[in-house]
């Protein structure tokens, strides 16, 4: 009983003192994303890149409005980004929030030895393209966790 109580107290104190990495938020009129505050951002003509200072990968966000891309072509569009020979069924889609269709695709670039994870949110003529790319040797443990947490924090406002 005492051992259980000591273990319980230890676990409670451990989880209550565990620190979350401080974050900052990149925000536009249309979306927001939160990422570690030590990471950098660039805005290259409306294409946003968010990356750790050692530049071993990045999250890239592009938004398109008045884009005439039929939903039936979106999976082909995603595969074409990587010149992938994968079948369209590897691109998963589901009904997302706020009326957007969400597409997900994972790709490993053998030549560059990099992982690519893509999300596309599409509604009518609006499309948000969010990607993670990360060198294979860093796609583990902490970096994978940080990239995924930032990726999952992406929220469309409208």
Residue ranges and their predicted role:
Residues 8, 30-34, 109, 132:
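Intrinsically disordered, low-complexity regions enriched in Ser/Pro/Gly/Gln/His and often acidic
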Residues 41-129, 136:
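Conserved polar/disulfide-associated segments of primarily extracytoplasmic proteins
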Residues 6, 98-102, 151:
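A general secondary-structure boundary signal
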């Amino acid at each position: 009983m005492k051992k259980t109580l000591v273990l319980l107290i230890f676990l409670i104190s451990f989880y209550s003192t565990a620190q979350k990495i401080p974050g900052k938020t990149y925000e536009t009129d249309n979306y927001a994303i939160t990422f570690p505050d030590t990471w950098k951002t660039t805005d290259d003509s409306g294409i946003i890149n968010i990356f750790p200072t050692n530049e071993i990968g990045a999250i890239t966000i592009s938004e398109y409005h008045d884009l005439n891309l039929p939903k039936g072509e979106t999976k082909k569009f995603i595969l074409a980004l990587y010149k992938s020979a994968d079948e369209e069924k590897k691109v998963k889609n589901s009904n997302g929030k706020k009326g957007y269709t969400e597409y997900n695709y994972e790709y490993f670039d053998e030549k560059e030895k990099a992982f690519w994870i893509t999300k596309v949110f599409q509604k009518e003529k609006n499309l948000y393209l969010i990607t993670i790319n990360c060198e294979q040797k860093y796609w583990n443990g902490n970096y994978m966790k940080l990239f995924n947490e930032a990726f999952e924090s992406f929220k469309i406002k409208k």
